[in-house]
């Protein structure tokens, strides 16, 4: 499923598609595959759902989100463009025109290189000053 925010990011969720079905999707629809900004990696990032290289190239995601899965089963791919929910916890996306500001419940130190720190963006705190979401970075789309 692909979702486009008006004047903003294009997201794709591939659910639990395993690699063979992804390859079939690519082979059947290769001329119609959209380029996207943020991909939720299929099958929670498990190796059994690893993206075929030709499909990944066609989609051209700027950022990949890997869902919760036991670490030994995850295919991290290019870890410089991924955020894993195992590390980040909950992830919140705030779309503002051509930027997506990303917040996570856990502070992450190994941030994807596609994210930059935007001046004025800060952690989100509750009324007692406790951080409830850490500002992780901004993706330009």
Language model features with spans:
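Active-site-proximal loop/helix segments of hydrolase catalytic cores
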Residues: 1-74
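Binuclear metal-ion centers of metallo-dependent hydrolases, dominated by the metallo-beta-lactamase
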Residues: 63-141
């Amino acid at each position: 499923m692909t979702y486009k925010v008006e004047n903003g990011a294009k997201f794709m969720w591939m659910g639990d598609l395993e690699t063979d079905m992804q390859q079939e999707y690519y082979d059947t629809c290769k001329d119609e595959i959209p380029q996207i900004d943020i991909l939720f990696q299929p099958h929670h990032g498990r190796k059994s759902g690893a993206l075929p290289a030709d499909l990944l190239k066609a989609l051209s995601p700027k950022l990949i989100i890997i869902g919760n899965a036991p670490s030994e089963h995850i295919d991290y791919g290019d870890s410089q463009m991924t955020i894993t929910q195992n590390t980040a916890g909950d992830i919140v996306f705030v779309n503002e025109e051509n930027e997506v500001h990303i917040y996570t419940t856990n502070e992450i130190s190994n941030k994807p290189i596609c994210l930059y720190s935007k001046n004025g963006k800060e952690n989100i705190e509750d009324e007692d000053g406790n951080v409830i979401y850490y500002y992780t970075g901004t993706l330009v789309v």
